[in-house]
Amino acid sequence: MKQIAIMKNKIYRKIHYIFWHRLHPGRWSLYLFSSYRHYKLHGKKKNIEELPESIENLYLTQMPNPGAGIGHQMGNWNAGYWYAKLFGVEYAYSSFSDPSWDSFLGFGEGEISAEQLLKKGYKKRILPYFDEKSQKDVQLIREIIQSYGGKKIVFFTGLDQFYEKQFGVMEEIRNKFNNAKARKEEVSIYEKNCLNIAVHIRRGDIVIGQENQDPSLTKRWLTTEYYARILKDIVKELEKGYSYKIYLFSQGTEQDFPELKDIPNLVYCLDMPPRESFLHMVRADVLITSKSSFSYKPALLSDGIRICPANFWHGYPEGKEWILVDEENGLTEGQLSSLCEQVQQTKKKYGEMHEYN
């Protein structure tokens, strides 16, 4: 029975994706949502800021896509948290498909869940899809929410409602992660007496994408040469006086990465369990990400230096600790200089545990 339910869910998500994201139905599709029909019947109300008492029982959430990986699901979660803040209502927690990630991330600690609210008699209402960059769309969603003022409602955004920047909730999720109960049991293979550099190279499914030229997968591809060039440039600078180790998080075997065989102090962490890999990317002094939400999300939680591909579908915050690399040209002299300056600051963080000349 469980397998049948999983299959039905996959079929539903596929049809849902094709209808909303491939066919792009017009404005008429708004009437498919009861929340929009309610808004049309009850008309525009006062600004929600003028009626604070009316929004006390309004919540918003986004369900993590159960068919996606944890990086994608975190993107869904972040979107729900962000849109609740944007529209001035309370956030209702939605669990990840694997409960072990709930306890690992700790995002639900101190939050009331959508499931709890529905059991208390709150009504579920699904919001229409909207373009977050369209003021007209955002205002419409705001007015739909306002039309329910005074009622007990949990609003659900559409499946995979997009939120591009993601870093708008960076401080909140970092605080949640660092204060989660699971942090008390945190175990790391990193050495305290050297600079720890984590590299995530996405392979697995996108290798197949290279073979069949699936555009949804080829756009996620970065060659191993891209990483080798970055690492060689970094090593050249670090060998001037820093003790360091490089940890590679990916899938496969060492033989799958011949371009990296000459990189010194390289530790292969291939096929490490997902949560352990995720944690080590978060805790790295320097994190080199891929075109993958699985390393982008740890970058949002990290306090370290992040080196990221500039061409990515989620945004990056401004700041010297975010070094955005051109895929063709690699690190510039200015970026290498900035990296070295920031690495030097680790001396203040770790005292004399790093070996400096």
Predicted regions and their residues:
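Soluble, non-transmembrane catalytic domains of enzymes that act on hydrophobic metabolites at membranes
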Residues: M1-Q3
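Histidine-anchored nucleotide/phosphate-binding helix
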Residues: M74-L86, Y227-V235
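A structural signal for short, well-ordered beta-strand segments and their strand-loop junctions
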Residues: L60-T61, E90-F96, A198-H200, Y247-F249, ...
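A short, glycine/small-residue-rich beta-strand->loop->alpha-helix junction that serves as a flexible
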Residues: N65-G75
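Pan-eukaryotic secretory-pathway lumenal catalytic ectodomains of glycan-active enzymes
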Residues: F312-N357
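Secretory-pathway luminal glycosyltransferase catalytic domains
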Residues: I11-W20, R27-Y59, P99-Y242, L339-N357
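Donor-binding and catalytic core of enzymes assembling or modifying cell-surface/extracellular glycoconjugates
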Residues: I70, V235-A310, G315-Y316, E321-V325
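Short, solvent-exposed loop/turn segments at secondary-structure junctions
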Residues: G67-A68, F96-W101, L159-F162, R202-I206, ...
